[in-house]
Amino acid sequence: MKQGIHPEYKKVIVRCACGNEFESGSVKDELRVEICSECHPFFTGKQKFVTAAGRVDKFNKKYGLK
């Protein structure tokens, strides 16, 4: 690899909109994210499941099917 052409990789603090902070590596000075593992619904277990039954009923009602 050539010397002096690559950006400096350093430790940075990643800040989430929820207030959580953690350390990671990046070539940027600071990282801000909107969602992290502390507030993402997949990791918190507060997922919202859309039931397909409601959509099927709506389709059947719209087109007169049983």
Curated annotation (Swiss-Prot):
Record key words, sorted: Metal-binding, Ribonucleoprotein, Ribosomal protein, RNA-binding, rRNA-binding, Zinc
Origin: domain of life: Bacteria
Protein name in UniProt: Large ribosomal subunit protein bL31
Family as reported in the entry's similarity comment: Belongs to the bacterial ribosomal protein bL31 family. Type A subfamily.
Subunit-level organization: Part of the 50S ribosomal subunit.
GO molecular function, one term: structural constituent of ribosome
Keyword Ribonucleoprotein assigned: yes
Pfam families per UniProt: Ribosomal_L31
UniProt xrefs under PROSITE patterns: RIBOSOMAL_L31
GO cellular component term of the entry, any: ribosome
Cofactor section: Zn(2+)
Species this protein is from: Geobacillus kaustophilus (strain HTA426)
Positions of Zn(2+) binding: 16, 18, 36, 39
Any single GO BP term: translation
